[in-house]
Amino acid sequence: MPTRHATSGRLLYAQSGGVTAVINATAAGVIEAARARGVPVYAARNGILGALREELIDTRKETRAAVAALRHTPGGAFGSCRYKLKSLEANRAEYERLIEVFRAHDIRWFLYNGGNDSADTALKISQLGKAMKYDIRCIGVPKTVDNDLAVTDCCPGFGSVAKYTAVSTLEASLDVASMASTSTKVFILEVMGRHAGWIAAAAGLAGDGADAPPHLILFPENVFDEAAFLAKVKATVERVGWCTVVASEGIRNAAGQFLADAGTRDAFGHVQLGGVAPTLAELVKGKLGYKVHWALPDYLQRSARHLASRVDAEQAYAVGKAAVACALAGMNAVMPAIVRTSDAPYRWKIEAAPLAKIANREKKLPKGFIRKDGFGITAAARRYLAPLIAGESAPPTKNGLPVYVQLKNVAVAKKLAPWPPG
C-alpha cells in the first residue's frame, strides 16, 4: 500500500555545519513561507543533534518582526553543529531515533540547511522514512561559504564571504603599499576553502592587471610549488615594491600533504588545518628576507553581515521559501538549486534538483577559472564571480553598531526518553 502524503503536520527546520552571514535569511524564508500556508514550524536546537535529543524550538512564539529581522542577522539563530550521521548500515539506530522524534511531534516535512554532508543526511532520512512507512518529505537547503555544492550555480553564503575577501584584499593592499618603503613588503591573507578555491578566487576581484593586488592567489586545485611561489613573490616586490598573497587554507604540496596540517580531524572526518599564512610567512621571511605580515580572518569572513552581498542575501531568502514550496508540493529528496540564466545582466532562477546528484559531491574551481601561470583568475572567473558580490545589504544600526535579533527560542515539551539511551 503506498504511503499517504501528509496534508497536515509540522515542518522541522535545522541548520548544519559552519554558519554564514545569510543563513538566517534562509530561516526567515522558511518560516514566513510556512506561516503563509498555515504550517507550524519547529526548529532543531543545534542542528541534527537537536532532532536526535528532541530539543525542538517552537517558532510560532516568535513575532513577525523578529522573524523578519533574521534576514539581516548573522550566525545561526537556532544553533548549528558539526555532527555527521554515519551510514544507515553502521548506525541505523540514529536514523530510527529521528523517525521516532518526527512521529512523536507529527513532523511531516524536514528541511536541512547545510552543505554536502547535510544533503547526504536528508537523502538517507528520506530513504529510511519510506522503509519505515513514515510519511516524511526531506528537503536539502543549500548553504556553504565554500561554494562547493554540485548542481547549484552558487551557494548561499558564498557571495558574502567572497565580497568580504575581495574588499579585505583591496583595503589591506592599500595599507601595505603605504608602508612598503620602510616596513612590510609582503602581506598574506589566508581564506577558507579546504578543497575548493572559490573563496580564494574571489580575492581576484580586488584588482585587474599585472601589478594590481592580489599579486598571487594560491588555489587548492593546484599543487603548491615552493620555488615558483618564491620566484613570483621576489619578482613582484622588485617590480612593484610590495606583494599581496591570498592563500586558500587547503593548499597542498607535491606529496599531497596540506601545508598546514595540524594532525587532527573534525567531527566530519575533515583534516584540521593549522595555518597556511604563518607557514608561508616563515618561508618568505627565511628564503627572501622580506618583512611579512599575515592575517587569518577565520570566523570574521563568514559572519560579516555588515558587508554582505545583496544578491547573496536575496538568494538565501529565496531558497528558504523555495524549500517550503518543494516540501508542500510533495517533493522528496530534492534541493532548491540556483540556476544562472544570464551573466550580464545577471539573472537567476530556482529549480528543484535531486539530492542524489548533490550528496557527498564536491564542485571544485574549473581549470578555466585559473590563469595559466596558476597565480590568478581568468576573465571567465570574473564573469562568474562579479555578480555574486553585487549590491549592498547593510543591517539597521543604532549608536554606530548593527542591530541584530535574538530569538526567544521557546522549547517544545519532550515526549520521548532521553537520547542517547542509558
Q: What is each of the regions a protein language model found here?
A:
Residues 41, 101, 112-114, 120-135, ...:
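Accessory alpha-helical/coil subdomains and C-terminal extensions
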Residues 258-422:
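C-terminal non-catalytic interaction/assembly regions of soluble proteins
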Residues 20-30, 51-52, 94-96, 116-124, ...:
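Short glycine/serine/threonine-rich phosphate/pyrophosphate-binding segments
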